[in-house]
């Protein structure tokens, strides 16, 4: 998976993002600072679906500091990069599949991301969510953009990736100091707000 991503996506886009970081790049990595309240210390009912899910596979927030983690090719959770590289990869989606002359997919494929796959209560996050193909979609409670044709997702610690098809913008926020929230933190949300405030 790492070689495919490097050869077909990151390389052609010039994105400094890796799924399976080569050991030669370790010195460039800024260490993550674990959240004040880590997952094990969150107040979950251990018998709830959220508790059984999140507490059954705890990841020590210091684990990404290890060579084994960095080198592992874990597409859903093990990528290594900076905000610029995450936004660069997502810019291909924001620009209809082609950015700076590099075509990764057709405009029709990009539009398929908006096809709703589910809409309802997420029993782990314990809130309403809508999913398209691989991303969260516009929802009253989760308005990331004033434009309904946007999609997004985030990661443990507070990272955010946002794609807005109407404005052809992508935005990413990644952090070293992890937040304890499961659904994004105020730092990333404030950057999203500032972006849209500046485009009015």
Regions from the language model: what does each represent?
Residues 79, 124, 128, 152-153, ...:
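Short amphipathic alpha-helix initiation/capping segments at coil-to-helix junctions
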Residues 145-151:
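Short, hydrophobic/aromatic-rich segments at coil-to-beta transitions
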